[in-house]
């Protein structure tokens, strides 16, 4: 049976910023001091004889306390716990998720820093009696550990404890203490009476709407409880106006008298099957005295190299990265109402050696965006909550009304990323995640990771493409490039439109309405592609053809005109065959001499990225497993 604490255990843990209880298996035995209930949990002070730190047991350990296995002044061995920061204070606390009682309850609090027996003997008797009302012999033990006198303990009923807590609590908290605090994970639409204690980890803007039922306003907040569970709460009209100013980002509240329903996946911003609605009769009270035990904003970071999987999806993502550059603010005219709105682009990088452009809009562009511009030379780390992934330049990110930006967050991910960048990242050449993906345009092009199909899906469904162009991505081999086809056309160097030879000399451009002495050649090439399901001919224009052949049309024309034993022109075409690419294509139907023909046109092409393809296959397997279950 353990009879002593681990000396200096707490100071050792607090001095190690990267401490991980799951990997550091050194034994840590502390004494439980000042054990008291907070909602459905218990807080205490962990004492190692020299240092004390605030701590909390998770709800899973509450039965151990109720059964008496863990008691006040008892000794416990910490098996699994985390060290968290207390909001708005420069102190920390332990969140204990697993422990075991290792000794019987001691008479008093352990104090290794107390005076020795000889020093204490010199103290006046009156002072000694004041500090030792029970027995002087209990003050000093042979090990040098001094025990503070055991406090008088009187058994109290639950109603007495709750009554005392309500009497000492601030008026704002008394409402919440009349009911049991429920964890978010336990809520469902069929409960009618609950109280939750949550932190506002994200707050949206007040938005006005107009529909067939009338006009109104709405705003929402993201709430997080002690377990780290999140839920989105939405308020309309009177409730929105009532609670918009009351809810402050980062503060903790008791909330009751709300309702739950299944979350709309189209608008869901957190990982929860339910969403909450608060009306004007809901109760919201601030719980400022206990905010330290509610975690800050919870992020689920996506590495930059994996962003392609989220392009044009409804799911919002969180991102962390090192700031590489910050642009000045620019004004963009919104199409819906012609209003000018501010925008600022920042470029972020992470350990995948990839970069991505994030567009900050509205207040984020002028507020935090300006802060980032002022400190860009310091390469700060930023974490962004709720980003929309688009396909501009392959992959692009944009903030929305509920997005939240944190500069230099105090998190393990941020510290690790900053350490990597300072030690090696700033010397490494980065590449854009969008390179190798087709740019966005009005023709409907998207990321090469979306709408992936086999060639047979395109060739065997001609009726799908009768009304308008349909876009797909496909992975295929180039099997043949016909050498005697018309490979290019003569183009204007200014506008790229077709030119005709002038009567005297030079070239005439209808687009520019002027004559030029020279022109350039631009590809208009047909290639046959093949995969495991079939084959088809596709049309490729200049930019995509250059990627396929590895040279410009002018360079290929020069090879074609050269004479020699080896036909360099045909050799160049053969080199491009039987290489695998990912194509973004549009499929349309054209009518020629009364016959409908399918036309497949390349909109984007990229070499095979084996890492990205592997992730895509794993995602497909995961989706199929979920469907079959």
From Swiss-Prot:
Q: Where is the signal peptide?
A: none
Recorded hits in Gene3D superfamilies, A to Z, give: Nucleic acid-binding proteins (2.40.50.140)
* ZnF endpoints (C4-type): 492-512
| Cellular component aspect of the GO annotation | nucleus
- Swiss-Prot/TrEMBL keywords: ATP-binding, DNA damage, DNA recombination, DNA repair, DNA replication, DNA-binding, Helicase, Hydrolase, Metal-binding, Nucleotide-binding, Nucleus, Zinc, Zinc-finger
**What Pfam family is a match for this entry?**
REPA_OB_2
> Which biological process annotations from GO are given for this protein?
DNA recombination; DNA repair; DNA replication
Positions of region (Disordered): 112-135
Name the CDD domains on file.
RPA1_DBD_A, RPA1_DBD_B, RPA1_DBD_C, RPA1N
**Where located?**
Nucleus
Q: What is its main location?
A: nucleus
Q: Where is the composition biased (Basic and acidic residues)?
A: 115-131
GO MF terms, alphabetically ordered: ATP binding; DNA binding; helicase activity; hydrolase activity; zinc ion binding
Annotated region of DNA binding: 194-280
Q: Is Heme set as a keyword in this record?
A: no
Q: Which InterPro entries match?
A: Euk_RPA1_DBD_C, NA-bd_OB-fold, Rep_factor-A_C, Rep_factor-A_N, REPA_OB_2, Rfa1, RFA1B/D_OB_1st
Q: Which domain of life is it from?
A: Eukaryota
Oligomeric and partner information:
Heterotrimer of RPA1, RPA2 and RPA3 (canonical replication protein A complex).
Q: Which family does it belong to?
A: Belongs to the replication factor A protein 1 family.
Report the function annotation for this chain.
Component of the replication protein A complex (RPA) required for DNA recombination, repair and replication. The activity of RPA is mediated by single-stranded DNA binding and protein interactions. Probably involved in repair of double-strand DNA breaks (DSBs) induced by genotoxic stresses.
Q: What protein name does the entry list?
A: Replication protein A 70 kDa DNA-binding subunit D
Q: Which organism is it from?
A: Arabidopsis thaliana
């Amino acid at each position: 049976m353990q009879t002593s604490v681990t000396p200096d255990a707490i100071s050792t843990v607090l001095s190690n910023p990267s401490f991980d209880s799951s990997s550091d298996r050194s034994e840590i035995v502390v004494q439980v001091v000042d054990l008291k209930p907070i909602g459905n949990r218990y807080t205490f002070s962990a004492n190692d004889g020299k240092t004390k730190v605030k701590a909390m047991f998770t709800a899973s350990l509450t039965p151990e306390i109720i059964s008496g296995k863990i008691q006040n002044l008892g000794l416990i061995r910490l098996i699994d716990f985390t060290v968290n920061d207390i909001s708005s204070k420069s102190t920390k606390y332990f969140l204990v998720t697993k422990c075991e009682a290792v000794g019987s309850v001691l008479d008093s609090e352990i104090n290794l820093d107390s005076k020795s027996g000889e020093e204490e003997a010199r103290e006046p008797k009156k002072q000694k009696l004041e500090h030792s009302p029970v027995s002087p012999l209990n003050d000093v033990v042979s090990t040098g550990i001094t025990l503070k006198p055991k406090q008088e303990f009187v058994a109290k009923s639950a109603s007495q404890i709750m009554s005392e807590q309500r009497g000492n609590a601030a008026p704002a908290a008394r409402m919440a203490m009349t009911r049991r605090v429920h964890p978010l994970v336990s809520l469902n639409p069929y409960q009618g009476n609950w109280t939750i204690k949550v932190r506002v980890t994200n707050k949206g803007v007040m938005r006005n709407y107009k529909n067939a039922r009338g006009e109104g306003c709405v705003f929402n907040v993201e709430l997080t409880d002690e377990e780290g569970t999140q839920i989105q709460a939405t308020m309309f009209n009177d409730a929105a106006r009532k609670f918009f100013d009351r809810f402050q980002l980062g503060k903790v509240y008791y909330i009751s008298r709300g309702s739950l329903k299944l979350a709309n996946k189209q608008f869901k911003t957190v990982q929860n099957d339910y969403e909450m609605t608060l009306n004007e009769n809901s109760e919201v009270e601030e719980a400022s005295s206990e905010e330290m035990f509610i975690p800050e904003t919870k992020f689920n970071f996506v590495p930059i190299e994996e962003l392609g999987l989220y392009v044009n999806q409804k799911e919002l993502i969180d991102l962390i990265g090192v700031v590489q550059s910050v642009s000045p603010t620019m004004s963009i005219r919104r199409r819906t109402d012609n209003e000018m709105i501010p925008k600022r682009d920042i470029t972020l990088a992470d350990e995948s050696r990839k970069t991505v452009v994030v567009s900050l809009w509205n207040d984020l562009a002028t507020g935090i965006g300006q802060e980032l511009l002022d400190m860009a030379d310091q390469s700060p780390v930023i974490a962004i909550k709720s980003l929309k992934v688009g396909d501009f330049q392959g992959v692009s990110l944009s903030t929305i009304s509920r997005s939240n930006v944190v500069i230099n967050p105090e998190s393990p991910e941020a510290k690790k990323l900053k350490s990597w960048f300072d030690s090696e990242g700033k010397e490494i050449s980065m590449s854009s995640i969008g390179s190798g993906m087709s740019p966005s345009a009005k023709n409907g092009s998207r990321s090469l990771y979306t709408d992936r199909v086999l060639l047979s899906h395109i060739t065997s469904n001609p009726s799908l493409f009768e009304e308008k162009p349909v876009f797909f991505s496909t992975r295929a081999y180039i099997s043949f490039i016909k050498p005697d086809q018309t490979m290019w056309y003569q183009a204007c160097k200014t506008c790229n439109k077709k030119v005709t030879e002038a009567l005297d000399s030079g070239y005439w451009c209808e687009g520019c309405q002027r004559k030029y002495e020279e022109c350039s050649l631009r590809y208009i090439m047909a290639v046959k592609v093949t995969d495991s399901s079939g084959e088809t001919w596709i049309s490729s224009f200049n930019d995509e053809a250059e990627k396929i052949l590895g040279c410009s049309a002018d360079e290929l024309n020069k090879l074609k005109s050269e004479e020699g034993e080896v036909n360099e022109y045909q050799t160049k075409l053969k080199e491009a065959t039987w290489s695998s690419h990912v194509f973004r294509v549009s499929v349309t139907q054209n009518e020629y001499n009364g016959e409908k023909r399918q036309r497949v046109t390349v909109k984007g092409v990229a070499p095979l990225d084996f890492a990205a393809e592997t992730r895509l296959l794993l995602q497909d397997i995961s989706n199929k497993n979920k469907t079959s279950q």
